[in-house]
Amino acid sequence: SIIKKAYPAAEKMTDLLDGALMNAGPIIHPPLIMMNAGPLEHFDVWDIHNEGTQPSIRSVTDSLDKERISLREALGYREPHFPLKNHYDDTLEEWMYGNSSHEKLTNSGDWREKIDLHNHRYMREDTALGLAFLCSLGRWKNHLMPISEGLLAIASGITGEILYESGRSLESLGLADLTVDEMKNMLEKGIAV
């Protein structure tokens, strides 16, 4: 294809949902901001990618990513899934951002910032839109997503909003009543206007 010629490393996606389930933001950022809420609110600036990325937080991130991959598989999507753990370990298969990307990120100092837990994009985009969407897909497919649901509940407690209701979900998009076959058909052919 013309895209493969222009971008040889590009991976072919089955459909839009396949691509959406590759978004790393809802996997990386919700654990980092929820589990670093104290330091983020206490210190003037805090680097969630450096001091904020500790073994227990990485463990939650890996568990969250396993849910994403398991959901992809339950929806019939095949590899590559680009597991996030590869971003943190250059001895594993190269991740979508390339080897050494995490080291470059933490060494840059660019991420030492003030994060407002109510309005920052990690809460508004990656959590209220991205993580809520993953939770809604899990509910729709009757696929357990306890880490996703737990982080979304904590985020709701922080913001004082029920982010599942105010965020992006199949319900808010008017797609929750579709069957799996209807969803696949819509993703392949679009919506008749």
Give the location of each predicted region.
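Internal alpha-helical scaffold of NAD(P)-dependent oxidoreductase catalytic cores
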Residues: 1-85
